[in-house]
Amino acid sequence: MILSIESSCDDSSLALMSINDASLLYHIKLSQDEEHSTYGGIVPEIASRLHAQRLPEILKKLKAFLNNDLSPIKAVAVTTRPGLSVTLIEGLMMAKALCLGLQVPLICVNHLKGHIYSLLIHKATSDMQAILPKNTSLPQPLGILLVSGGHTQILHMRDFNAISLIAQSLDDSFGESFDKVAKYLGLGYPGGPVIESYATTFMRDFPHIAPHSFPVPLLHNQKLQFSFSGLKNAVRLAIQALPQPLSLKDRGSICAGFQQSACEHIVRKVRLYFQSAQAQDLEHFAIVGGASANTYLRTTLNELCEEYNKQLHLADLAFCADNAAMIGVCAIEHYKRGDFTPIDEAQISPKSLLNDFL
């Protein structure tokens, strides 16, 4: 089995994956949402300190699951890029110590590639029995919308080490814009779930009232690129123009209108990708990353995939956000290829360089 570690941002997570059949044997995750909600976003120093406290705590639970017998572990995998340097280092230090103690190889995993491999994981059960993967491999070629943290990208995957970057954001990411709008509205952090909740409630309670209208970013731009800064600013100005304090109805209308505009922007750019020469033989498309849990985004992209006869692949909702299970299933591919990193050469990086990741 492979022990995997995830600490790229504000989630401390460990997992055990079977090398033979890619089944998830054990998974534990501690989130820091409550600690960061007061600040409206991640505070790196707080995140680092909490990882230093919590990673050893959940390692004790993992050891107890194995009855303190770590001999079945044949490799340790850890996220080394991209992410916050002060949190990545906490995971890497633990991984190095485990590799030295167990005399097993180290596997460095790109966090973004881990999100892609989250497509293969089933939801964990309460008793943590072995969970078989949905499939043993990803369909290829595979078009991918990656909406995770600071990333909004369209990727074209031909093989494990052949992933082309098709489009990315010029400024804010899809997820960051949700966090910023939630902060403008005083709704706390993280913004994605709360904005979706307000939007859903508004559409349910006021079915005959159109939500606040916002411009779709880059509406007449035919280039494969994203931008959310203008939309974010339009929301800020709309909030300022409304009577204060905002009513629940106004908050819901803002959330619904913003969500519709942001998702329409995504759909329009994915449509351009589907119409491109590179995607003409594409049969499979996937949405991955924490923000891929948004129901409205899933629904609108599913409709687009049906229009273009593409099979849509979605990660289980339990594994959309950061987790060690996705790092583990990706690490299995590294393990099979003999792709190990000497302990003294392992490094972290806050960025994922194009020629490094793709």
UniProtKB/Swiss-Prot annotation:
Any one GO biological process: tRNA threonylcarbamoyladenosine modification
Residues that, per the record, bind substrate: L146, V147, S148, G149, G150, D179, G192, N294
One Pfam entry name: TsaD
Cofactor: how and how many bound: Binds 1 Fe(2+) ion per subunit.
Superkingdom of origin: Bacteria
The EC number(s) this enzyme carries: 2.3.1.234
Cofactor: Fe(2+)
The UniProt record lists the keyword Nucleus: no
Signal peptide per UniProt: none
Catalytic function, reaction form: L-threonylcarbamoyladenylate + adenosine(37) in tRNA = N(6)-L-threonylcarbamoyladenosine(37) in tRNA + AMP + H(+)
Keywords: Acyltransferase, Cytoplasm, Iron, Metal-binding, Transferase, tRNA processing
InterPro entries xrefs: ATPase_NBD, Gcp-like_dom, KAE1/TsaD, Peptidase_M22_CS, TsaD
Binding site for Fe cation: H111, H115, D322
Localisation: Cytoplasm
GO molecular function terms noted in the UniProt entry: iron ion binding; N(6)-L-threonylcarbamoyladenine synthase activity
HAMAP family per the UniProt record, alphabetical: TsaD
Family recorded in the similarity comment: Belongs to the KAE1 / TsaD family.
General function of this protein: Required for the formation of a threonylcarbamoyl group on adenosine at position 37 (t(6)A37) in tRNAs that read codons beginning with adenine. Is involved in the transfer of the threonylcarbamoyl moiety of threonylcarbamoyl-AMP (TC-AMP) to the N6 group of A37, together with TsaE and TsaB. TsaD likely plays a direct catalytic role in this reaction.
Name used for this protein in its record: tRNA N6-adenosine threonylcarbamoyltransferase
